[in-house]
């Protein structure tokens, strides 16, 4: 596969991630699926799961800058991170181990539905009402395991899951965003490890530049582009109204989600 399209994808995902504060996975996964299908680099049955696995590996490195920035700003609620991150990490790792067993069409449909939900949230600018106290051990474990599993299955770092959850449990938005960014690194690392170790369970996935289910060639290009573009995205976000950006991207994501759902019918 040519390096330029991968670098371009990294630039776009980093730019949008910096502008909108979203996980790059919502851009990387559908774009990689299209690139893999056009290049015939992987078989059609493996395209979706490889795109998800590679996305998780990309997010490990691209989320470092966001986590560091939030740490320096002093907005991270470490007591919340300590309660949730072990369960999110476990859920993401389990997703990496089990998702390769999913039927290709089912996996793509599930990701399409998730993207459809994210698009709706952006278009409607929806935020949950802060109405409950933070849960105890059982509630934290169930929340973390389920949220981590969805994050790992969809190839995202968890921000689209973590932030609404924390706000729902009465955590201020800026603290929820900061804590989510901090949790993104271990969640993505756990998911990527699961996909790397889970690869031997999937027949027919092998070749050069492959670490389990992670396409290292794609990872290199996307990561390089995202690291370059993310700081620029943050600067743009300070000059352009965030609500407008989210609605525009939400409309684009709606089209992507519908395409994902349609293409899942042919797998």
Residue ranges and their predicted role:
Residues 60-73, 113-135, 235, 257-267:
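Transmembrane helix exit motif
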Residues 88-93, 104-124, 214-231, 242-265:
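Selective transmembrane alpha-helices of multi-pass membrane proteins
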Residues 70, 92-100, 230, 234-238:
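Small-residue-mediated transmembrane helix hinge/kink sites in multi-pass secondary transporters
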Residues 46-52, 105-108, 130-137, 243-247:
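Membrane-water interface of alpha-helical transmembrane segments
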Residues 94-98, 149-157, 191-196, 256-267:
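Hydrophobic alpha-helical transmembrane segments in multi-pass integral membrane proteins
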Residues 75-79, 129-133, 174-175, 238-243:
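Membrane-interface helix-boundary motifs at transmembrane edges
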Residues 19, 72, 101-102, 124-125, ...:
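Helix-loop junctions at the membrane-solvent interface of multi-pass transporters
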Residues 3-83, 87, 141-144, 151, ...:
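Small-residue-rich hydrophobic segments that form or flank transmembrane alpha-helices
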């Amino acid at each position: 596969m040519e390096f330029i399209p991968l670098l371009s994808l990294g630039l776009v995902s980093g730019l949008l991630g910096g502008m909108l504060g979203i996980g790059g996975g919502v851009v990387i996964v559908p774009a990689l699926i299209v690139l893999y299908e056009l290049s015939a680099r992987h078989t059609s049955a493996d395209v979706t799961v490889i795109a998800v696995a590679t996305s998780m590996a990309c997010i490990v490195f691209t989320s470092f800058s966001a986590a560091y920035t939030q740490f320096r700003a002093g907005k991270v609620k470490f007591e919340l991170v300590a309660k949730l991150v072990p369960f999110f990490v476990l859920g993401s790792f389990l997703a990496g181990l089990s998702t390769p067993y999913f039927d290709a069409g089912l996996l793509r449909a599930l990701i399409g539905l998730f993207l459809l939900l994210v698009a709706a949230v952006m278009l409607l600018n929806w935020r949950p009402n802060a109405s409950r106290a933070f849960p105890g051990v059982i509630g934290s474990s169930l929340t973390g395991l389920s949220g981590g599993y969805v994050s790992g299955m969809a190839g995202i770092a968890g921000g689209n899951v973590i932030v609404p959850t924390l706000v729902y449990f009465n955590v201020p938005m800026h603290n929820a965003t900061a804590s989510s960014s901090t949790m993104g690194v271990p969640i993505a690392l756990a998911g990527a490890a699961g996909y790397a170790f889970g690869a031997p369970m999937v027949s027919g996935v092998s070749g050069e530049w492959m670490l389990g289910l992670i396409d290292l060639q794609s990872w290199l290009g996307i990561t390089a582009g995202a690291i370059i573009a993310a700081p620029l995205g943050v600067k743009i976000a300070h000059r352009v109204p965030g609500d407008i950006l989210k609605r525009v991207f939400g409309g684009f994501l709606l089209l992507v989600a519908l395409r994902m759902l349609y293409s899942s019918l042919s797998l």
